[in-house]
Amino acid sequence: MSSGRGSRIPEYWYGQVPVPPFMRFMEVIYAGAVSLRRLAYRRGWRRRYGVAVPVVVIGNLVAGGTGKTPLTIEIVARLREAGWTPGIASRGYGRRDLKTPRWIQPDTPIELAGDEPAMIAWKTGMRVRVDVDRSAAACALVAEGCDIVVCDDGLQHYRLMRDIEIEVIDGQRRYGNGHLLPAGPLREPMVRGRLCDFRVLNAGQYSDRPTSGFGPGDWQMRLHIDHAQSLQGSRRRSLDAFSGQRVHAVAGIAHPERFFSMLRQRGIGVVPHAFPDHHFYRAEDFTFGSRLPVLMTEKDAVKCRAFADDWFFSVPLRVELPTVFWTALFDRLERLVSC
């Protein structure tokens, strides 16, 4: 049984439950506000800001996570290998002082950084700037010598001009019931995705079988797990070492069951503990009543290093995308810089 502490998503978003009439009414109001906002930027009534380097925005149309941050980390790593100096812009959701722009280092306190920016800084070692104004964050990154800006989230932040948009879609949940907030999970209508340069479908763990519902413009992303990293020291263990054992599995992400399922597929006996997305952990959260190894996502691990002991392990995700995706992305970037 799960600990039951995960964030609550309305059943009608992804289930067969009818949408309450009041939520349908609120959806109409929300849809009008979204349309007016986009119109204001298209007509120039609201100003947009650009920078002198390419800007890549990675985002999604639904509320909640879809796998943007692992893809952001992989894209940043590929850019570095190709000789770029990427900087990452983020809103820093979940940090306690959203109004203050901040540079994020691997050792920045989590309450000041936010969990996703902290994880990006920890994994990439690159410049990370958090600011509710992504355009201001982009300017700060360029001033520090970055020659490309990667935005973790921000598809709806039209104030920042962008060169490439990448939409990330949960390959299992897709767009839910297809309704806009609050009647459904959509921040914008589904047709908005057609305007993006790339659409990446997070199909979860590797499978030789094709995932249904993929269109010709979709790129399939697969996530792999193969080892666990101790939060104390550099000890690394293959996940095969946990096969046949029971572990406490911790996930404070938008879709905890995906992480639990990936562990089960490795033959691990999962005692699941789902926490709300962006949850700030305390040592008391881990009073589970039994002494078992604790396996968690990297996003959770960055918030537990201060009190973790030798029984705490993070499970890194490895992203796989077709070679042709990377070729298409870098060809697009080369065309941008050669113009």
Swiss-Prot record:
GO CC terms in record: plasma membrane
Protein's GO biological process: lipid A biosynthetic process; lipopolysaccharide core region biosynthetic process
Pathway in which this enzyme or protein is active: Glycolipid biosynthesis; lipid IV(A) biosynthesis; lipid IV(A) from (3R)-3-hydroxytetradecanoyl-[acyl-carrier-protein] and UDP-N-acetyl-alpha-D-glucosamine: step 6/6
InterPro entries with a match to the protein in the record: LpxK, P-loop_NTPase
Alphabetical keyword list: ATP-binding, Kinase, Lipid A biosynthesis, Lipid biosynthesis, Lipid metabolism, Nucleotide-binding, Transferase
Swiss-Prot/TrEMBL catalytic activity: a lipid A disaccharide + ATP = a lipid IVA + ADP + H(+)
Recorded superkingdom: Bacteria
Any one GO molecular function term: ATP binding
Pfam families to which the protein is assigned, alphabetical: LpxK
Keyword Acetylation annotated: no
E.C. code: 2.7.1.130
Binding-site residues, ATP: V62, A63, G64, G65, T66, G67, K68, T69
Family to which the UniProt record says this protein belongs: Belongs to the LpxK family.
Stated role: Transfers the gamma-phosphate of ATP to the 4'-position of a tetraacyldisaccharide 1-phosphate intermediate (termed DS-1-P) to form tetraacyldisaccharide 1,4'-bis-phosphate (lipid IVA).
Descriptive protein name: Tetraacyldisaccharide 4'-kinase
